[in-house]
Amino acid sequence: MASAGKPTLDDSRRATGSPKMKARENAKDTLCRNVTIYGRCRYEDKGCAFNHDPHKVNTTYQSDSRRRLNVDSPSFTPSLLSSNGSSPTTASVTAKKAATISPKAANAAPFQPRNITSRSNTSTPSGRAETMTPDWSVAEVQEFVPQGFDTAHMASLQGNSNGGVPSTSPFDPFVTASNPLSAASAVGPVQANPFAHDTAAAAAALGGAFFAGQSGFQQPVQYHLYAPIGPHSQNTLGYQRNVHDLFLPNDFREELQKKAAATLQTLPNTQLPAQVDYFHSLVPLDLNHQKNATIFGFPSWVYKAQSSKDGNFYALRRLEGFRLTNEKAIRSVQAWKRVCNGSVVTVHDAFTSRSFQDSSLIFVTDYHPLSKTLAEQHLGAGNRFQGRHNTHIPEQVLWGYMTQIANGLKAIHSNGLAARILDPSKVLVTGKNRIRLNACAIMDVVQYDTQRSIAELQRQDLVNFGQLIVTLGANTPSVMHNPTKAMEHFTRAYSPQLKNSVFWLLNGLQKDQDRNIDIFITGISSQLMSTFDSALHLDDELTSDLSRELENGRLVRLVTKLNFVNERPEYEHDRQWSENGERYFLKMFRDYVFHQVDAQGDPVVDLGHVLSCLNKLDAGTDEKITLVSRDEQSCFVVSYKDIKKALESSFQALLKPTRRLH
């Protein structure tokens, strides 16, 4: 049995009876599998005995079938059955050569050109010398570049019908031979190449059929990665980071939190009415509890209140003891509702009320928490250190105030109205160098019967504007009692351009020339550009801060998915669903993140550990961790990538429609 299973050396050298050599004789009619799988054979020029032309294989099979069916066909050996590259004319010569073949010749077959048909008719042994000299050059073989398809490339794979040597094209892994015995199906259906960058060229090469003008596929955004958005004002090295690169700036965060706390502030055990019309939860905002009727002619108070209609917070300004004599006076507030400007506090409503046990006039405006007035900010109003000297206002800050006030006056005058009040105690500072005109609609109701034209009131606004700037520049509220001394101080402290602009405003009542807010804005256009540039820088800074808070709820989504899967009592009538398979080590991962204990058995409450684990889970890193069950009988060594895959698959299983049993 051993001798029969292992042939001797003499038997292996007998080519006539060896099935191995018989297979090699038929190799010229067999299409190389490398062409079918990869599109070309890398050993085609290094001794591969199989055929590398699909078109020729089909022709050979068809010719063989015709010869077998034709009784008049002569008896001769086809040239394609040659195994050594020579072209003998008789079957006896072929058998003789096959009988005397050496083992070295079997292992290293001579080169066979692709278009072997052109040399198959030679009947002399001199054909061996021709086959040893290749008729192609290395320059014809192009390196594979995964670009779009072209018709020449497809034609070269399908074969050349005129018998010439086909041009060598780059290998394309997306073109395969589906049937090696059929020339029509030698090349499979052309699919889209995802590595091609020019989809339009590919569509044009294929005739434009079934190609829509759409963009290429893009991977989804990884929400656990944050791209730094400019501007980048700090020159730091690549490995350096600071707190502001990761979180919201502390001062900005504290400011927003303080404003939120001030908005939600309540005053228990107050003597204020519980409800004023449709407002409730009143909180006084005045710092001075003394009655002052200098500005409006009536004592005024300011409150914060919440609306019962929309739940928003508003500021209520109450004029104490006001009696409405003309109903048209309060209707004049409707015109102020159309004024929508960033430098003017928006007016929403006005009504009379007896909730304060008197006749009061209530104005409803926007509420800006923690805002101050210009008098409190620069003139020391409401400050307990009244004797301390106020700081000098920089000229650039003063120009910023002027441009914002001019912006508000232009919006008011464009609607056919007049501000009528430009006092430091009625201009709010809602942010850093950010001001808004307040209490503008009150005088239209209080002094409704005063017969003054709108043009005259608008010119008076210019004069009040100039007096406000002089008061701020002199740092004292009583400066207008001595205008000459005030202007001398203003001239010494500020530039001639600012001084000339203020002089122009103070002369607004003169009728020698036309004076309006548009002419004034044209005169300070250079400063408007500076203020506009500062606003653009602030917008960039806020956008950069906002980008750090992008997708800040991703960890909450992870914890939510974990809680959906863990400890689920039943799913599809399976009470052990959350305890089997990949859901089991999700439960162990939950214990690893939240239920760790130290060496003494005390709970470990470490927010940094929780955030680190959840961030790694969100990223799906390859870091491996050891998960141990509660009874210490099971232990898993898994990566965060595996845990993320298990979490997603378990969560997607919950989203599938349930199968109902009937």
From Swiss-Prot:
Cite the residue spans of the region called Pseudokinase domain. Answer: 265-525
Compositionally biased intervals (Low complexity): 86-102
Q: Which gene encodes it?
A: pan3
**Keyword Cytoplasm in annotation:** yes
Identification of the protein by name: PAN2-PAN3 deadenylation complex subunit PAN3
Localized where?
Answer: Cytoplasm
Q: Where is the composition biased (Polar residues)?
A: 72-85, 114-126
- Renumbered to this chain, region (Disordered) spans 1-26, 59-131
Instruction: Specify where the region named Knob domain lies, as residue ranges.
Output: 565-662
Q: Which GO terms describe its molecular function?
A: ATP binding; poly(A) binding; protein kinase activity; zinc ion binding
Q: What is any one of the record's Gene Ontology cellular component terms?
A: PAN complex
Its biological purpose is as follows: Regulatory subunit of the poly(A)-nuclease (PAN) deadenylation complex, one of two cytoplasmic mRNA deadenylases involved in mRNA turnover. PAN specifically shortens poly(A) tails of RNA and the activity is stimulated by poly(A)-binding protein pab1. PAN deadenylation is followed by rapid degradation of the shortened mRNA tails by the CCR4-NOT complex. Deadenylated mRNAs are then degraded by two alternative mechanisms, namely exosome-mediated 3'-5' exonucleolytic degradation, or deadenylation-dependent mRNA decaping and subsequent 5'-3' exonucleolytic degradation by xrn1.
Organism of provenance: Aspergillus oryzae (strain ATCC 42149 / RIB 40) (Yellow koji mold)
